[in-house]
Amino acid sequence: MLCADFLNTLYKLKINRTFIEHIKNSSIKKSNKCTYINMEVEKKIDPLGFREYDARWLYPKSINSKGIEAVGKGFGTQVISSEKNPIVIVGNDYRSYSEEVKNNFIKGLLSTGCNVKDIGLCLSPTVYFSQF
């Protein structure tokens, strides 16, 4: 959420008017100190990230957090349609953004009714073999 006073600063700095109008047209919430404007982040997913046997993107350049959540929701929808009460195992690597990506993916999975087991920091083969 952005404070409406911040919008005035943007106007003074002659920031992109289209961006400002988009912000102004978002839903508005009042508080004691100032007016807040809710800015929803649009999901971004580069379709070229989907490969034959996996998916790979540069985060956040090719996919953002809402996009990751949507991929989790799509995956969860596929899993839940073929199995009753599925358990999906997830893990993450050492990269600085991996935890954020994993959490958004889990959010998408949970929204479909999948059960999730998070095994934390691990190698890819660990996730694969953890299903047995």
Explain the meaning of each model-derived region.
Residues 6-7:
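Short hydrophobic targeting helices and cationic amphipathic motifs
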Residues 26-27, 31:
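Serine residues within intrinsically disordered or low-complexity segments
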Residues 121-132:
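Conserved phosphate-binding catalytic cores of ATP/NTP-utilizing and phosphoryl-transfer enzymes
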Residues 111-120:
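A glycine-rich helix N-cap at a beta->alpha junction
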Residues 38-105, 111-112:
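An N-terminal, well-structured beta->alpha segment
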